Amino acid sequence: QLLQESGDRQMREEAVAYDELYNKEHKAFVVSRMSIEVFKPVEKYSDVDVETWIIPGKGANFPRGYEMYKGGQLVAKAICNWALVDTVTGKLIASKDYDMGTYSMDEAPELSIPRRFRIPKELKFQEVESSKVAMSMIDINMHMNNTVYASKLYDNIDDAEKYFITSINLRYVHEAPLGSEFKVYRSDAVD
């Protein structure tokens, strides 16, 4: 959530507020992939600083980098890939066709986790949650907010309080609109 909020703040301070982009320009950023690496736990109500910047994109990809600091020490970093969609036509907007010149820009942060991987076919998954997308879960696009997906996954880890999650890779394949059903599947850990 802190990463997303930092992106929203950067938009407001350096270009256009997200609600203005959505309501006046009829455009929406939709996340397609998120890779987060965590080095130290960040407890609730911790004072942290989050830096975010735009990474030069290609095609319809608008990547964004993040670094989170607690007490001056790097505790997490991430790369997220976003698409910009025309909400009237539903068409993707190429990065060359949308001016990001007023945004802070830099290269992608280096992550030590793979950004892409294949899930082994032999894994056996079982459904552990099935529910409907509720009002408290949605964003301005009327779809489940991207931060809710990670929370739902975490909620379905047995004895989660015993573990420190060091990374997460999310690939968003479909949007989950208000009222739609979503399911969480889990497999046993493998070496």
Stretch-by-stretch model annotation:
Residues Q1-E51, I55-D191:
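Terminal targeting signals and extreme-terminal segments of soluble enzymes
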